[in-house]
Curated annotation (Swiss-Prot):
PANTHER family documented for this protein: ADENINE PHOSPHORIBOSYLTRANSFERASE, PHOSPHORIBOSYLTRANSFERASE DOMAIN-CONTAINING PROTEIN
Gene giving rise to this polypeptide: apt
Quaternary structure and partners: Homodimer.
Subcellular location as annotated: Cytoplasm
Keywords: Cytoplasm, Glycosyltransferase, Purine salvage, Transferase
InterPro entries: Ade_phspho_trans, Adenine_PRTase, PRibTrfase_dom, PRTase-like
Name of the protein: Adenine phosphoribosyltransferase
NCBIfam families on file: apt, PRK02304.1-1, PRK02304.1-3, PRK02304.1-5
Reported function: Catalyzes a salvage reaction resulting in the formation of AMP, that is energically less costly than de novo synthesis.
First-listed, main subcellular location of the protein, grouped into a coarse class: cytoplasm
Amino acid sequence: MTATAQQLEFLKNSIKSIQDYPKPGILFRDVTSLLEDPKAYALSIELLVERYKNAGITKVVGTEARGFLFGAPVALGLGVGFVPVRKPRKLPRETIAETYELEYGTDQLEIHVDAIKPGDNVLVVDDLLATGGTIEATVKLIRRLGGKVTDAAFIINLFDLGGEQRLEKQGITCYSLMPFPGH
């Protein structure tokens, strides 16, 4: 099933926009409203599975927290394992970490050292692409473990914020179901 204009419009209409959240001047795109609609949620997963079903994916990685909500069902649909990337000290086994820059300061992500095997063909899934910093750090973790990652899938791409261009410089092809201007 290739996404039709009608299906994509249905998904886009399931996203609520909240003005001035979390601060004045921001138009927040709330993906949780899509999750509240089982038809929209199921369709978003079906479309991502359809796109990647013949891509030879061996693992799906999702970044905390909403990446879990989309990545895990995509992994099930593809018949492959799901690997969570989390904030520090949330994973119980041995991990490696990657620090990345935020607008004001830094943050860190971790992955289990045994979750990705050398040669794994990994798809990164997250709810939203903005500046790309979180996904860039996720890609670095996967590659440090020997995984191959060339694709990342998103429900929403805030295309004005430069995330897609940032990830393309890292050799990542980005796909999103819904582009929105970023604010």
